[in-house]
């Protein structure tokens, strides 16, 4: 029965160890870490070989290839978003987070003022209102029509413009994260559309 179950669910595995290729990615930035690359035809995933100390270590984003990484807590979700913006150019942001800091809100606001972020919407957990009242009040004041509250634990960032449709999914919040964190940068339109529909609907039904 176990064998039958494994056979039936084999298609659902994202990456098989036997498919791994130990080649290094060429043409990356000088400060980027080597990536272990799966068979592009099979999966289209780049796996960071080491824990990242800075988003730049991920190298250049390539449409159709996803990046999987662990970070040592040296950067948070907002810093990762800004790294991506340097490659996409001005883009819209839809962000979900379980917690957010005043520094992160201020940094996002600066990007809006400079035009690097074309628009911003936030989905945040209901408990931010009571657990982090100062950041919540700052968010309400700075982005009065751009946030919604709901019961939420997902950490997702959608960045999009005419050329890019990017989904970031991981364990990082929009706060300082001095812990081991896991993340994935999806560059496929299908993943983006899936997340955008879900989160857009949640925004429409959320509260202020």
Task: Please name every model-derived segment.
Residues 2-208:
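PLD/PLD-like phosphodiesterase catalytic module centered on the HKD motif
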């Amino acid at each position: 029965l176990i064998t039958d179950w494994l056979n039936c669910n084999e298609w659902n595995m994202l990456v098989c160890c036997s498919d791994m290729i130990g080649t290094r990615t060429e043409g990356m930035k000088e400060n980027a870490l080597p990536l272990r690359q799966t068979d592009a035809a099979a999966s289209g995933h780049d796996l960071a070989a080491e824990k990242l100390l800075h988003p730049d270590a991920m190298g250049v984003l390539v449409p159709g290839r996803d990046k999987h990484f662990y970070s040592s807590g040296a950067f948070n979700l907002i810093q990762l978003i800004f790294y991506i913006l340097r490659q996409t150019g001005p883009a819209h942001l839809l962000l979900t987070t379980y917690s957010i800091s005043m520094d992160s809100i201020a940094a996002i606001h600066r990007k809006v003022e400079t035009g690097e972020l074309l628009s911003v919407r936030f989905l945040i957990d209901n408990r931010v209102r009571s657990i982090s009242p100062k950041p919540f009040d700052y968010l309400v004041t700075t982005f009065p029509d751009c946030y919604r509250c709901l019961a939420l634990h997902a950490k997702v960032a959608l960045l999009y413009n005419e050329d890019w449709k990017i989904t970031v999914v991981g364990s990082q919040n929009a706060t300082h994260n001095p812990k081991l964190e896991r993340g994935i940068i999806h560059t496929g339109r299908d993943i983006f559309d899936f997340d955008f529909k879900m989160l857009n609907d949640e925004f429409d039904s959320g509260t202020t």
